Amino acid sequence: IDLNTGRVVYEQDADERVYPASLTKVMTLLLAVEAVERGDVHLDDTVTAYADCNADMVEGASNADIKVGETMTFEDFLYCAMISSANEACNVVAEYVCGSISAFVERMNTRAQELGCTGTHFANPHGLPKDDHYTTAHDLYRITKEALSHELFATICNTVKHTVPATNLSEERTLSNTNGLINPDSPMYRGYYYEYAKGVKTGHTDAAGYCLISTAEKDGVRLLCIVLGGKGTARANGTTDFGSFSDTLTAYRWVFSHYGWRAIVSASDLICEVPVRYGRDGDSVTVRPAQTVSAVLPAADSDGAPQFEQQVTLY
């Protein structure tokens, strides 16, 4: 999707309901950031991991090894949740923001409706599988677009590494972003670094497959790409190709090589001459655009043909 205009460049099954895995955390962080902006909570608040923060975890679920009773700042819990994809951190954040996980999940669903989502229902703040926890690519775009409009959200999801100071129960730890597009040392997804990429979030469960929301910008063209249900395919060298990343890179490289900013009309273009009756200084006025109007469009043909048709309406 072209982030400058909201124009869909390519889509496939964008309204199919699927499990989002940890892409859920985009909504979780959005609600946390909005709570900070309202002044309901503060980044430097001291927050304690409550007794049941690990209660709904499953074996192998991503975590930041947060211990019950451990205290750190609210900001550090946000970094744990987003760049380390720590599920227990999401529970702590939800409890702190809304008083209970159930109240937070209710707020997630309300916010999704406010953003125009029609195929989404959340059942938890982290994305571990539940039958009634689903979304669509279109809805994830709506949620992510709103989230990226908040500076704090954009900063956190684009952070490659973050250091959490020593706590009452743990030594200092360095969190490493799971997104291999922006972190060449990603704990899971190496070999996909892309210089034009920025956050947003990785996700994986057996039910959801490999999922990725990301953005990239080149020559003023800003794109958002969402891949859901990617496969993990063994390579001959013993490594794994993760479809969420390889498909994303294929999409970015294709769009950036075939699309670009094109001037629809230029401020110097003469649109027409409009007759003026009884004019003091002439019998017509020249109509030109107040400014150049551009859009992201397919590149011109080799002969320079514009590949689009201009239609100008005078009011």
Task: Name each model-derived stretch.
Residues I1-H138, R142-E151:
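Active-site-adjacent loops and short helices of periplasmic peptidoglycan-processing enzymes
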Residues C117-T118, D132-Y134, H138-Y315:
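Domain-terminus/edge residues, biased toward the C-terminal soluble/receptor-binding domains
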